[in-house]
Amino acid sequence: MTGWPGGARAGAAFTFDFDAEEVWIGEDPANADKPGVLSQGTYGAKVAVPLVLDVLERRGVRATFFIPGRVAERHPDRVREIVAKGHEIAHHGYTHTSPLKLPPEEEERELVKGREILESFGVKVSGYRSPSWDLSPVTLGLLERYGFAYSSNLMDDIRPYRHDGSGVAEVPIQWILDDAPHFWFDAATWTKKISTVEEVRSIWEKEIVGIRDLGGAAVVTCHPQIIGRPGRIGFLEEFIAFVQDLDDVWIATTGELAEHAA
């Protein structure tokens, strides 16, 4: 890495996996017939995405939205709104199905179809985040074949890097900076408590500062249906402000971080 723009010490990106109903169907296909379960995803599209966009506009931040193709088909007006606000659109599957559950030919079809749908909104899609951050043995080869610039799925570094023998960059992520492990609740399992905003604030602030001190890139992963709850949306804005106050951190899209891969 040659350094971050403007002499910044580190980079950061705010990313949003706009899964809507698809995440619940991907978790259990039987959920397709459970309106109560799916309504959690509908909230993400109906209420939370506009709240998130308002926060980003107030803070002057350009983010990356990873969107399954089927979500774009179901909620095209929301995708158009995201595009109109100038945010990066990136690939998140056609359905929210892990590549590990698909034969190679079906994974390829999902990759091609999802991208075609997203690019029908007038944007170039160069980034890929798989559902559940899972990569199959053929995923990186498919990304290379179809000209994707970057993947944002692995947890083996804190700096963007290039895959060996590949033109595909990796923009690393980590569960600690994902809202789902802290806030997600699935009534089918009842196995975890819902964390408080203050617990997550402490964890995220310490992680961001630690990555900054090491000169890395912090990629925050949020889901509108999770972070966009009324008691959390204010926390999102406060956390973005906290990162902005670290004036030696360059805030960018995931695609822009990928351009600085070693």
Residue ranges of each PLM-predicted region?
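Surface-exposed cleft-lining segments at the edges of enzyme active sites
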Residues: 125, 185-196, 223-225
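Catalytic alpha-helical scaffold of carbohydrate-active enzymes acting on polysaccharides/glycoconjugates
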Residues: 1-127, 132-176, 198-220, 228-262
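Glycine-rich, positively charged active-site loop/lid region within alpha/beta enzyme cores that binds
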Residues: 169-192
